[in-house]
A protein has these predicted regions:
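Short hydrophobic/aromatic-enriched beta-strand-loop microsegments
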Residues: 6-13, 63, 84-90, 136-141, ...
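A contiguous loop/helix-start segment that scaffolds small-molecule binding in enzyme catalytic cores
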Residues: 32-33, 112, 119-238
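RNA substrate-binding interface of SAM-dependent RNA methyltransferases
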Residues: 1-8, 77-81, 87, 95-96, ...
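Short amphipathic alpha-helix with an adjacent loop that forms part of the alpha/beta core around
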Residues: 21-29, 105, 162-166
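Class I S-adenosyl-L-methionine
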Residues: 1-66, 74
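General beta-strand structural signal in soluble alpha/beta enzymes
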Residues: 65-68, 115, 141
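Class I SAM-dependent methyltransferase SAM-binding "motif I" and its flanking Rossmann-like core
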Residues: 51-109
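Short, acidic/turn-prone active-site loops that include or flank metal/cofactor-
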Residues: 11-17, 69, 90-95, 144-146
């Protein structure tokens, strides 16, 4: 009212976030822009919004975070991960063994964790994450947050090297690694498995899971886990 801004408002809270996410996706499909705001705290960090952000990103829409108290909080708000808290670690230091031990400790903590990295060391960190992070953990890589060339990408460890080949290191990085996923009873239908199996040899796991999620309506993580499991079983047989 103070700035005479007129727009349609609707509430999103812990009891209706699924419906709220669907409404947001409907508006985006119509070519509209949507702002997720709170009267206190940061959306998807201190307040509800994780489901909305995750669904919007899964459907290929861009999420632009408003500058927060720090780069870590800003990155988490745009990552669309679970809101149960996170561990900020910053830069991994020390030699190869010390870094590997510290990274494994973070992975085993059961919490989302945040790393910082400089461009000239990014390739080294990508190597370490590719080797250590389980294939079903989402990794969000953000660079140049709140600046002109801001970039936020979410992927999984098997796709990190391919991502790096298309994104030469530039700017300062915030890396958010998801916690271990809870077990789920959702499984793909036999029909979906059949056509996904046909495409597994032709497309990277991340790209295929993104496409299949839009077609089948199953979460990308479930499809990605199926693809990785299928590839591993085929490798064992071979």
């Amino acid at each position: 009212e103070k700035f005479n801004i007129e727009s349609h408002l609707f509430p999103v809270h812990q009891h209706n976030e699924h419906e709220g996410a669907e409404k947001v996706l409907t508006y985006l499909a119509e070519g509209k822009r949507v702002a997720l705001v709170t009267d206190a705290g940061t959306p998807a960090v201190s307040d509800p919004g994780t489901k909305v952000v995750a669904d919007v990103r899964e459907h290929g829409y861009r999420v632009i975070p408003i500058p927060g108290a720090s780069a870590s909080v800003t990155a988490v708000s745009a990552a669309g991960m679970a809101p149960e808290g996170f561990t900020f670690h910053g830069f991994l230091n020390g030699g190869k063994k010390e870094r590997a031990a510290e990274l494994q400790k973070l992975i085993n903590s059961g919490r989302i964790f945040i790393l910082y990295e400089a461009p000239h060391r990014l390739e080294k960190l990508i190597d370490e994450l590719s080797e250590a992070v389980p294939a079903d953990r989402k990794i969000t890589i953000a660079r140049e947050l709140t600046k002109k060339f801001e970039q936020i990408d979410s992927l999984y460890s098997p796709d990190l090297h391919e991502w790096l080949s298309h994104n030469p290191p530039k700017g300062e990085y915030v890396i958010v690694v998801d916690a271990a996923s809870a077990s789920t009873e959702e499984t793909l239908t036999e029909e979906d498995r059949q056509w996904i199996d046909e495409l597994i040899p032709l497309l990277p796991a991340g790209q295929l899971s993104s496409i299949a999620s839009k077609i089948s309506r199953f979460p990308k993580k479930i499809i990605y886990n199926y693809i990785v499991s299928k590839k591993n079983s085929q490798a064992t047989v071979d």
